[in-house]
Amino acid sequence: MKRALFIGVVCLLAGFRTASAQDFPESCPDECTSIAVGRLATTDGSVFTSHTCDGVSHSWVSIEKAADHPRGAMTPIYKGTRKNFFRGDTTGVKIVGEVPQVAHTYAYLNTGYPSLNEKQVAIGETTFSGPDTLRNYGSMFVVEELCRLALERCDNARDAVILMGSLGEKYGYADGGECLTVADKNEVWFFEILGCGRGKKGAVWAAQRVPDGEVAVSANIPRIGRLRRGDPDFLCSDNVESVARTYNLWDGEGEFIFWKAFNAAYGNGRNFREREWFIFNTLAPSLQLSFDAPELPFSVKPDTLVDLRTLNAILRSTYEGTFLDMTQNWKMTVPAKNGKPEQTLVSPLANPWLTTDMRNTLNTIAPGTIEFRRTVAVCWCSYSTVIQLRSWLPDAVGGICWLAYDNPGQSPRFPIFAGGTSLPSAFDFCGHKKYVPDCALWLFRRANRLATVAWQTDKKIMMPKVLELEDEALNAVSALEPDAQPAELDALTARLFQHAADEWKVLEETFWAKHGRGF
């Protein structure tokens, strides 16, 4: 009993110091999960892509306006914009080249990874790194700049994929392996890209269309398998196999499989881990996919059609109630009292978002208490998006970025429209480099962190509020007229955002009152 009580005390301290990206325990990318859904897999014909931007990508958000450009104009290409403090902050930003400008660029939502344009083209992202020998740091394009140009120039997903691939090939790709889930109001694609070697300008890439009736997941492991050249639902660069052979990533004899050739250590030789398996099994339990399988399919048909609420719930997931649940062994003994017998229960202090140090402390006290699992929702998330694209509505109203700040397992979502033109001032600054009380990230982060002090009880206060705000936002969006003007869209975004922020201020005060005498 003493050991159980002591673990409870440590858990109490654990609740306040939750995990950060720096505490991530494995030599693998810690950033991002994306779920993509075809139009025939949804309840109303929407196409979805999504993105949990896990890490310290900037939390400021702006809407970049459409523009016309003179013949012969060039556009600069940047590095260093993803972690600056505000729009226009040039600290650490470099111009590394330029490419010819087009006559007209579309308006787009400028998130850490640009995410939605006025034509209902949307992008989610996850990092899979791949073999470091392929990375050419001196090349021109990082992935966020590919996203920017695709959204500025393209009115459909296929063209966006082709543009990004061609830019990487022509000017060089500088990042590690990335997957972009590129969607429009009719279809969604997986686009996976890497460099082609140290000191070599170019890129290796492949893209596969998600079947209209299916769902696909990217979570830091490449997911594209066999190359299907000539298939209209598949695209790739010409050099895929030759680069793999040059760097001994494929022997040239067996069947070439993209994810096997370009996987990193995080995949452990497979094309999935916890997140992919959990999401597929949540959406298609009838398939009975095994966690011990050598690989999972690229996409699955869900047993039940998917909607926004479905995706919001999955992005909140920490595997609660499953064998992957990290809180299942956090026990606390409650002494017999008032005729009730002694009980051993999951501690009310147990939460799934601990630091490595706290996890190690608990496992030193009682070995085997916590087996680390990379959850879908993490507290080191900067922001997350669920982007809904609707072909039957005008683009301005049909495209919606449902944005949440901080931990998607705790925070509410509010809509930003493809036709929006302005955002509240709380979006102007990033909350990572310093504490900015009035920036959007911290308006939600404060209550979220306090809630983890006693998560098993605090979530019963917080989660009903998340669902209440979800209902309010969905009802407000459904009441919009198809011809709603930008001012009306902006006003709705501002109202729903402010209401959510106000409710999180009340929660912050509630949790201080509840826990203020000590953690």
Regions found by a protein language model. Name each.
Residues 1-4:
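Positively charged n-region of N-terminal signal peptides that target proteins for export
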Residues 133-137, 145-154:
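Second-shell loop/turn segments in exported
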Residues 463-519:
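Histidine-centered catalytic/metal-binding microenvironments
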Residues 348-479:
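Substrate-recognition/cap regions that form aromatic- and gly/pro-loop-enriched pockets
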Residues 16-21:
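Sec/Tat signal peptide C-region and signal peptidase I cleavage site
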Residues 242-392, 396-397:
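Glycine-rich, aromatic-lined ligand/substrate-binding cores of catalytic
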Residues 7-15:
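Bacterial N-terminal signal peptides
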Residues 23-142, 163-166, 170-312:
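A contiguous strand-loop segment
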